């Protein structure tokens, strides 16, 4: 047997089948960084229409989690797709660097402020800590393939940012939106005043720990016949008169415990510990209730004639107690915030000396700590006390009197939602914004309608100061307040917030020093981050005053979306964004949120290290982010399978462009019909993909690409052209036509993929266009001539067999469509039936390869007419050695009818060829051996090996 391998055009490419993403991606990341790719993109796109996606600042604390990855990757996909569409789309990352979590972490290392570390050193350490966290998180984000201005992020701790926040506060004050109100603080009943954090020390104290029943009024959700009570645990019985709600943890599940006469509702994770403390026999129910199911239910106060709601709060302890706490907004920081969030009454029943006001039922005139015994007695009388025990624990004390202190509501600074019509203007601006998904508009409308005034002051150390001077007697602001804002902001821009805290009051107001108090409160960190429109969008020249898009998790309707909107309206009466897009939370396969306590966390770092960032990116893009986003090892495995399908498709096309350059491009009109068809199909898909990028529907894009790879390419076109690619002459018009099609398809597809599979797309681009710059410096591939009048609905065929259910528009489109393309669509409908028949014969060991088969097609006259157009090339379309056409009336009994809703009167019979196999093309043909010089070849191969080469027209 002769070896004809050298006469074949075998595929070859450097693009490997094995992705090895975890290792390979790092090389591309390094190249992007070394080439300063982000700067190249900015330079190239300068002057183009702008699209500004404004990054919500991530909190600079701890490792990034899967939710962070989802958020940043979605943003990256949008920015990259906008660049492809011809926009200048800068992406400036941001970090939120002030606030309590950073303070707590610094305290863990250095101790309490004012005790172990002075306040100025403490702030310096907070800056240092934030810097380190930003560096770590930035590296993790870059590893995900996110292109951004990582060298120039915006940080809320930057001196310029802090100064501009002070300037922004000045504008809000000037516009009449700020007033002084109330909030709970540490309170010493001996001093009769609030205490600063530095004036508080912790000592052991014996407290009365009690478990108390709150009977649930609306218990239909449980579908039980006995009463149900939620059990709270508290160490401050005296606060129960101020109760306004019961809080459950947002991430905990709850179960019913049958104690005989009634059910107790307890946290599933704490139920065993709780009932062991109660020392009672119970039956624990199997059904679990999520806290969100219970939110809003009403419960009966244990001894007052009032009902209060069940709410959610992340401050509920998850390692002790019952998983439920009672909420007294006047007596606790978290309780107060919960009260604001849920618009609860905030009434303080206790005077400055810690005595209940006389009008307080059952307890009037009693000192709070002595009233504990009275509260416990009342609970016993009302049969609502489940457990009482004494507990020794660390408790805050006054540093002067060494006595226990309490939380008591006191004055704070607020932004009024009513003054100067702020709420109305905010609502008006909401109507001008495009909210995605559409139902999120209603969500933020309700939140704005129901929200209380915004408490912007905090009694902490690490944050932007409220730079106000207040008259000691009248409470009025200094008459030169606006001028002082300018002066103080200029100082802070040079020295940071320390300029305010270190300075003497006299430095700013001179002789008025004795008449005014300097405010030492800091701003709520949401005010910090919410002012990024004023500090970043308005200031950085590559951005714009109003962002085209804000994109964050759905929780930010209550957070950054709202703080940005309110602060922007408070300054200039306009929303800071044109569009707002929200994504859901990431949950595990059981629909549970990721949390350490549940042990169900899947970290992005682990995914990247194991399977690569592109797999993570593909999962994110393929998931409908408008709801909860489910992730698991199995789901990631499916993403990896999808990735392999895409990679193998791209590899096949690259390998079959071996020896092809742009000089070999064939004009569209001169291409073979099948090649024109697939290019036109690709163009149509590209139109839909670009539209889906524009509307942020990425899961449709992934679905389209997967279907295209599996059905149009891998399941049809690529299989058909293998024969032409391998067996025709190297420079034959037929082969160059197919390579031209592959070139156009790959050029389009690599761009479709680049916002999602960023590393892989760069790898493809290096193979496809090694002398060109990065794929991220390209725009959509529109260079190929548009092929018009093409209908691709595989289920609609023009002719007598058209189903009656198709629309007139579809019918007219078919009549205008290219006739040969309709014939190709017919082939696509018939092909699966032929493949199934061949596969059955394979299993029965009648056939080996599909080229051992010959096919007889029995069809009506219209189908026969259309398939006849392919002539001898019809066999290539069905990847068999021969195809014969017959009238439908001639079909034998063993014929298999094509199962199609619209293509009628078509049946097939597959038989094994009786002819010899050509050793070069593997077709079984009658003419094998007819040439004395090439006895093992068919005439077609003889022509390709030792002649002018075969001529193809269709396939």
Swiss-Prot record:
Keyword terms: Aminoacyl-tRNA synthetase, ATP-binding, Cytoplasm, Ligase, Metal-binding, Nucleotide-binding, Protein biosynthesis, Zinc
Entry function: Catalyzes the attachment of isoleucine to tRNA(Ile). As IleRS can inadvertently accommodate and process structurally similar amino acids such as valine, to avoid such errors it has two additional distinct tRNA(Ile)-dependent editing activities. One activity is designated as 'pretransfer' editing and involves the hydrolysis of activated Val-AMP. The other activity is designated 'posttransfer' editing and involves deacylation of mischarged Val-tRNA(Ile).
Catalysed reactions listed for this entry: tRNA(Ile) + L-isoleucine + ATP = L-isoleucyl-tRNA(Ile) + AMP + diphosphate
InterPro entries per UniProt: aa-tRNA-synth_Ia, Anticodon_Ile_BEm, Ile-tRNA-ligase, Ile-tRNA-ligase_type1, Ile-tRNA_ligase, M/V/L/I-tRNA-synth_anticd-bd, Rossmann-like_a/b/a_fold, tRNAsynth_Ia_anticodon-bd
Protein name (Swiss-Prot/TrEMBL): Isoleucine--tRNA ligase
Chain location of the short sequence motif 'KMSKS' region per the record: 593-597
Residues at which L-isoleucyl-5'-AMP binds: 552
